[in-house]
C-alpha cells in the first residue's frame, strides 16, 4: 500500500467491519504481557544491524521528542498527554529500554499556537535528530507539523480523536477517526434517544468544522434527520449565552458539541446557569474527556454523553494497573481522559514497532507498523492497521458529578479504522 500523503480526495469503501476475536487482556500489570518482555529480552540487536543514520541514537541511549501545549488555551487538554508519555517512557526504561537503549526525551511547548508547533517540530527533527515524536492535540497543530515530518522524514505518534481524511507514512494515529467516533456515536444516540433534531456546535478550526460536516452528512443523508443549527466559536471563547438562548428556543433533541480546550469551562457553566439540565436535554460531546471535566466541574456537565474509546472508569486489569501507576507518578487527584490514554499508547507502540523492525530507521519503522499489537493497552487491546490508524472499540459514557464517566455502551469487538469513508468527504 502506498503511503503518500493523502487528503480528502482519496476514496475507500465505507466500512465499519469488526475485528472478530480480540486477544485476552493482560492481567498482570500495565507492562506488556510477560511473553512480550521475554521475547524482547531474548532477542539480540547488534549495533551494526540497528540503522541509526542521522538520528540521536547511541549504543546506550535513544532520544525522542514530546511536543504538546503546556501553556495557552489547549494546556487544559494536553497536559495529561505529556504526563502519560513520560509515564510510558519511565516504564519502558525500567524494562530495559528499546533495543537495549534507554529513552531520553526532549520536551517542547507548542503553546497553543500552530506556527510554534511547526517551528518546534523542525527543531526536534533537524537539530535534535529525535527518533520519534509524541505530540500535538488539535488537528490544526497536526496539519501544521505534517509537512515538517514528511519533509524531514520523522515519525509522529498523534493521540487525539480526529476527523479522518488523512493518512501519512510519517504518522501513527493512536486516537479514533470519524467512523469510529462521530458516525458510531450518532447512530447510538439516534437509536437510544429516538432523536430527530440536532444542533451542532464547535470551536472554529479544522477538526470541529470537518467533524460537523461529517456529522451533518450522516444526520441528513443517512439517518434522514434534521439539523436545526450549526455554530462555531474562536478557540478561547468564553461567551456562549447567545447560542444557548437559540438552542432553548429551537429545542433540539440532541446538542452535538465539539467545543475544545478552556472554552468548555465557560460553555458548560453557562449552560447550567441558563437552566439547561443535561439529565433531561441530551447532549453528546466528542471533545470533553475527564481532563476537561477537571476544569469544568462535574456538577456542571453531569448527564452529558461522550463518545470515546476510553474512560478512566473502565473495569479491566490493564486499566486498573495503568490508573494506579499514573496516580503514583502524578498524584491521586490527577484524572485520565481518552487522549491521555491514547498518548500513553504512543511510546509503547513505537517500542514494539522498533523491536519488530530491529531498527530505529524511520522507513523501517513505518513499514513494520501494520500489525503491531499492544495487549497491555489500558483500553484493552489495540492493533495498528495498514493505514496507520488503530483497530479499537467505540464506547459511550455518561458524565457523573465526580468528573468520571459511567460506561453505557461499547462495541462487542474492535472497529476497523476507515479514514476515508465514501460519501463523507
Feature locations, PLM:
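Solvent-exposed, acidic/polar segments of extracytosolic/periplasmic ligand-binding ectodomains
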Residues: 45-48, 373-425
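Hydrophobic alpha-helical segments within soluble ligand-binding/sensing domains
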Residues: 49-50, 117, 174-198, 209-210, ...
Amino acid at each position: 500500500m502506498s503511503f503518500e500523503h493523502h487528503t480528502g480526495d482519496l476514496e475507500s469503501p465505507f466500512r465499519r467491519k469488526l475485528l472478530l476475536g480480540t486477544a485476552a487482556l493482560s492481567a498482570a500489570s500495565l507492562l506488556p504481557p510477560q511473553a512480550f518482555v521475554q521475547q524482547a529480552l531474548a532477542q539480540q540487536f547488534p549495533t551494526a544491524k540497528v540503522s541509526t543514520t542521522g538520528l540521536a541514537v547511541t549504543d546506550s541511549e535513544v532520544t525522542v521528542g514530546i511536543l504538546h501545549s503546556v501553556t495557552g488555551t489547549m494546556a487544559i487538554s494536553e497536559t495529561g498527554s505529556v504526563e502519560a508519555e513520560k509515564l510510558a517512557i519511565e516504564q519502558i526504561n525500567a524494562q530495559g529500554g528499546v533495543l537495549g537503549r534507554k529513552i531520553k526525551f526532549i520536551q517542547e511547548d507548542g503553546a497553543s499556537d500552530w506556527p510554534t508547533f511547526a517551528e518546534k517540530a523542525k527543531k526536534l527533527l533537524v537539530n535534535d535528530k529525535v527518533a520519534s515524536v509524541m505530540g500535538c492535540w488539535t488537528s490544526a497543530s497536526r496539519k501544521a507539523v505534517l509537512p515538517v515530518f514528511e519533509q524531514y522524514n520523522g515519525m509522529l505518534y498523534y493521540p487525539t480523536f480526529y476527523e479522518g481524511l488523512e493518512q501519512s507514512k510519517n504518522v501513527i494515529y493512536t486516537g479514533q477517526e470519524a467512523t469510529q467516533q462521530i458516525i458510531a456515536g450518532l447512530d447510538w444516540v439516534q437509536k437510544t434517544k429516538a432523536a430527530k433534531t440536532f444542533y451542532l456546535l464547535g470551536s472554529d478550526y479544522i477538526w470541529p468544522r470537518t467533524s460537523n460536516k461529517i456529522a451533518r452528512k450522516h444526520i441528513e443523508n443517512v439517518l434522514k434527520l434534521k439539523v436545526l443549527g450549526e455554530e462555531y466559536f474562536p478557540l478561547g471563547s468564553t461567551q456562549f449565552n447567545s447560542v444557548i438562548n437559540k438552542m432553548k428556543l429551537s429545542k433540539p433533541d440532541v446538542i452535538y458539541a465539539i467545543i475544545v480546550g478552556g472554552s468548555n469551562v465557560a460553555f458548560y457553566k453557562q449552560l447550567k446557569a441558563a437552566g439547561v439540565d443535561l439529565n433531561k436535554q441530551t447532549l453528546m460531546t466528542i471533545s470533553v474527556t475527564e481532563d476537561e471535566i477537571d476544569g469544568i466541574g462535574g456538577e456542571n456537565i453531569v448527564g452529558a454523553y461522550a463518545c470515546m474509546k476510553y474512560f478512566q472508569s473502565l473495569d479491566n486489569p490493564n486499566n486498573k494497573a495503568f490508573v494506579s501507576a499514573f496516580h503514583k507518578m502524578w498524584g491521586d487527584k490527577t484524572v485520565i481522559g481518552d487522549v491521555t490514554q491514547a498518548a500513553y499508547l504512543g511510546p509503547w507502540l513505537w517500542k514494539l514497532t522498533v523491536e519488530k523492525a530491529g531498527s530505529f530507521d524511520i522507513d523501517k519503522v513505518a513499514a513494520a507498523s501494520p500489525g503491531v499489537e499492544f495487549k497491555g493497552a489500558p483500553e484493552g487491546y489495540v492493533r495498528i492497521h495498514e493505514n496507520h490508524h488503530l483497530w479499537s472499540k467505540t464506547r459511550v459514557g455518561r458524565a457523573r458529578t465526580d468528573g468520571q464517566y459511567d460506561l453505557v455502551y461499547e462495541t462487542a469487538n474492535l472497529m476497523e479504522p476507515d479514514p476515508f469513508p465514501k460519501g463523507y468527504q
